[in-house]
């Protein structure tokens, strides 16, 4: 048996969504959605606010396996889809919303800082696009050899 420590890498995903009403319009109800999803027993993901009040973000917890990462994520995503549907909302992800975007930007300290760095116009653009982020963490001590 080798005396070397097991080297692990970690994977994670983030998926951002616009919230839409039954007519396909963006709605600024993220705080309400976060409230009712907080009461659900989501074991594999965290639901977070985004820079706009018509957006939410689903974040996986770090995994060592691609297979478990995605299967666990989609189990909880199914619950999120069910809850938003029951509350007469739809999720729209990956890209920019094609209609009129009435997104209200947040004024938390974190977002005020981003606005100062990016400028008002560029910061507002952040509230007009949603994406998918796939994170890969290199094994610890990768560059120490």
Question: Which functions belong to the PLM regions below?
Answer:
Residues 134:
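An acidic/histidine-cluster motif and surrounding catalytic segment
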Residues 1-122, 128, 145:
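Terminal catalytic/cofactor-binding subdomain
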Residues 138-145:
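Inter-helical turn/loop segments and adjacent helix faces that build the functional surface
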